[in-house]
Swiss-Prot record:
Binding site for ATP: K11, F59, R87, T93, R104, N114
Compartments it resides in: Cytoplasm
PROSITE patterns, A to Z: NDPK, NDPK_LIKE
Alphabetical list of PANTHER family matching this protein: NUCLEOSIDE DIPHOSPHATE KINASE
EC numbers, comma separated: 2.7.4.6
A Pfam match: NDK
Self-association and partners: Homotetramer.
Name this protein carries in UniProt: Nucleoside diphosphate kinase
């Protein structure tokens, strides 16, 4: 088992449904601790920078528009195998394919408005956490 950190973003669709607390409860029940958090409205520049890896993909502009359409809740999570544990909680990217009881199955509307983002690797998690949080803002507990 490895203690890891991962980045999680509760997207505008889930924030609008007022389920932040419910999602946080799922993180904690799964052994993931919130070690940094911020509630904010992403700027276009922040969203484009964060999703730059997808810039050439056909869905890039729609993704950016969605991510700036309302506030998001951004958190760094820490725990044993946090990247995989968080992705298991999220479920499949397309909520139609997500297992019952996962965050996306319960709260997502579509593959585009899919409730949450989760880092896909330990390496990407480190970069993504650093994108939104200064080292002094991430505090283990």
């Amino acid at each position: 088992m490895a203690l890891e950190r991962t980045l999680s973003i509760i997207k505008p669709d889930a924030v609008a449904k007022n389920v932040i607390g419910e999602i946080y409860s799922r993180f904690e029940k799964a052994g993931l601790k919130v070690v940094a958090a911020k509630y904010k409205q992403l700027s276009r520049r922040e969203a484009e920078g964060f999703y730059a890896v997808h810039r050439e993909r056909p869905f890039f502009n729609a993704l950016v528009e969605f991510m700036i359409s309302g506030p998001v809740m951004i958190q760094a999570l820490e725990g044993e195998n946090a990247v995989a544990a968080h992705r298991d909680l999220l479920g499949a990217t397309n909520p139609k394919d997500a297992a019952p009881g996962t965050i996306r199955a319960d709260f997502a509307d579509s593959i585009d408005a899919n409730a949450a983002h989760g880092s896909d690797s330990v390496e990407n998690a480190a970069n993504e956490v650093a994108y939104f949080f200064a080292a002094t803002e991430v505090v283990s507990r």
